Amino acid sequence: MLLYVHIPFCESKCPYCAFGSVVGKRNLTSAYFDAMIADFREQILKFDVSQSAQNRQRSGKTEVSKQNSGEFDYTSEQTAKPNLTTKNAQISQNLNRKNIKNAAVNQKKAGLNLANSNLNTKECGKIETVFIGGGTPSAVDAGYYERLFEAVAPYLAANAEITTEANPNSASQKWLSQMKSCGVNRVSFGAQSFFEDKLKFLGRIHDARQIYEAVASAKTAGLENINVDLIHGTKLDTKKRLEQEAQNVRNLGVSHVSAYSLTLEENTPFAGKISYAKDSPRLAKFMIDRIEEAGLKQYEISNFGQICKHNLGYWQGKNYLAIGAYAVGFWRDHRFYNASNLNAYVKNPHAKKIENLSADELNLEHIFLGTRSIVGIWQNSLNTEQEQRARLLKKSGKLKFKNGRYYAKNFLTADEISLFIAG
């Protein structure tokens, strides 16, 4: 079981960003964390997340009785289907935030109450990983996270991976040290670039110097598992500049890099106004090669280095809880959508929508996620026609087969391969 925590507060809104975030509304911070804690406590009851004996003793009154918990108010999305058409086959970094985009759906109120529903939610074990994303988690005082982790800590597995995102300009050494005290052992910085003109183009409010300072502060705080996000495929990118980006990563000495191709999302300032680099696909391959030369091995289309257990869990199809506005959770064959509005979530954190996933839809997601990563596609998950198409791709050299799984030889061709296999 994984846990995703969404912090929507931002210092500014980047023109390429389609993730749920708000600028301002800091007066709601305390109420927002109260809502997330209430949401978490309700979900651990329903999904029967277990505590260790030691944690159960230590937590005392942390366990919440059903009589004192809030009430889930779920609606059902009966006709939702993943938006995996050829035009929209590029599943961007949303996958790293547990969210395959869905086409417009007809929503029908079903009056479901999760606490009393017939979903099969037997004990799912402990929480193996936590990912605090945003938004900008470092824009919120660490004291709020202390409250949150008082509720979460009793349910964590030993050696759980706990990641927080942070921006270089707001992640002070004090904040990073306090987050480490909460249990955080991995930090992901939204660097995006080391070039000042590119940072300005992307609407970032930090400079290159602050990236180096933030990474140094994280190391001083005792955080050694460090990721930096980079964006490539902008009109400013050239091979020479991307080579320098990779060299700067090497100089930082971080354990992980996420290198995303610029995605022009709908309903963002960039949509319809900004164009990609003319040779974006070739630049993407060039960037991959340079990052690997820096000593960080690719294990997913956009990820390199020490494997992020949380993201790996998404690609493996593990169950995950999700708390916070805009967050999306998953349990077996259901996806749960929290309110996509900050005020609405604070008012009722238990109101959610359910998307019921068919076996075919789950199979499709497994194919798309598997080809983009080291997870691969299980041979026994494919039907006869899909298996025949996979064999053709293996024969043509686009797939390799090992220990019962098919793997893409080039992650950049993953969507093309997936569409062909899925039929």
Question: What is the predicted function of each stretch?
Answer:
Residues 47, 72-74:
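Aromatic (phenylalanine/tyrosine) cluster motif
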Residues 51-60, 69, 87-96, 100, ...:
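Short, low-complexity, charge-dense intrinsically disordered segments
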